[in-house]
């Protein structure tokens, strides 16, 4: 699996949503991107990867709610900075 490519796909997906998108819908998109990028069998690893990049930890809050609270653009900026895109 190409982890960086999967995260880039997540960022691209986040760029298509608005700040007003409900947290549940954001969470659904995160699951969909994970499944599309080879994490269907182990979504736990997908979220672990997101947490490691975003927070430097293996665990974290529900990402849909975090992104909704922190901000879509702010989350994208944070992830791009961590990935050095």
Regions found by a protein language model. Give the residues of each.
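Conserved nucleotide- and phosphate/pyrophosphate-binding catalytic cores
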Residues: 1-85
């Amino acid at each position: 699996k190409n982890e960086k490519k999967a995260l880039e796909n997540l960022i691209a997906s986040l760029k298509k949503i608005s700040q007003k998108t409900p947290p549940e819908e954001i969470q659904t998109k995160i699951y969909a991107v994970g499944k599309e990028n080879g994490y269907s069998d182990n979504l736990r690893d997908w979220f672990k990867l997101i947490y490691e990049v975003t927070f430097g930890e293996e665990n974290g809050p529900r990402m849909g709610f975090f992104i909704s609270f922190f901000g879509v653009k702010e989350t994208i900026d944070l992830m791009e900075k961590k990935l050095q895109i």
